Each structure stands twice: as C-alpha cells, then as structure tokens.
C-alpha cells in the first residue's frame, strides 16, 4: 500500500518547483525580447541550481548565438531570481554584458 500521508506536500512541492521554473523561463524570454518566437522552445532553456542552491540558466547554443548577435556583445551574464509564496511564483532575469 502507498502511504497517503504527506502526498499532498509532495504534490505541492512539485507544483511549486515547476511553476518557478516556468516563470524563470518566461522571464528569460522576455529579457531577450522574443517570447516563444524565433523558433525557441522552453526545452532550449534549462534552470538548474548550483551546489549552494542558487538558480542559474543554461541555454542551447542557438539562443546563445541569438543573444550575441541581437545585442552585439561577445560575453554576457544572466542573473536570475526565483521566489514563490503560497500559490504564486515569480522570477526575474537581468541580462548584461560581461566585461570579463
């Protein structure tokens, strides 16, 4: 038998997890000014956490090249913040040229 105790918490955590990642991907696409156009898909963007739990964005090569061409930069940084409160998730992305 599957224990029913705690399954609601597991579902809630999974829902929050995916909602925050969706918000982060949407915020990123807005930061580069495309939305889901230019042939980009949500699967082209991956949200991961580093060893300290800080979220960051990994991009497929085609999006990396698009950013460099559109903004006429060679290197860039993506800053990501994700948060949630009860039934709401929010994310914001700052994209800036890297001087390093």
What are these regions (language model features)?
Residues 1-11:
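Single conserved hydrophobic/aromatic residue that forms the stacking wall/gate
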Residues 15-20, 24:
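Hydrophobic (often cysteine-bearing) scaffold residues that line and stabilize catalytic clefts
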Residues 12-16, 79:
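A short glycine/serine-rich beta->alpha loop
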Residues 8-9, 73-77:
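Glycine/charged-rich beta-loop-alpha catalytic/anionic-binding loops adjacent to active sites
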Residues 30-70:
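Mid-chain, well-packed structural core segment of small domains
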Residues 78-100:
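C-terminal edge-of-domain segments
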């Amino acid at each position: 038998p599957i224990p029913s105790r705690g399954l609601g918490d597991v579902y809630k955590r999974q829902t929050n997890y995916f909602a925050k990642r969706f918000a982060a991907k949407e915020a990123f696409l807005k930061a580069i000014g495309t939305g889901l156009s230019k042939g980009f898909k949500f699967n082209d963007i991956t949200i991961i956490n580093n060893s300290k739990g800080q979220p960051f964005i990994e991009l497929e090569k085609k999006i990396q090249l698009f950013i460099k061409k559109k903004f006429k930069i060679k290197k860039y940084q993506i800053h990501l913040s994700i948060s949630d409160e009860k039934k709401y998730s929010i994310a914001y992305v700052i994209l800036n040229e890297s001087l390093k």
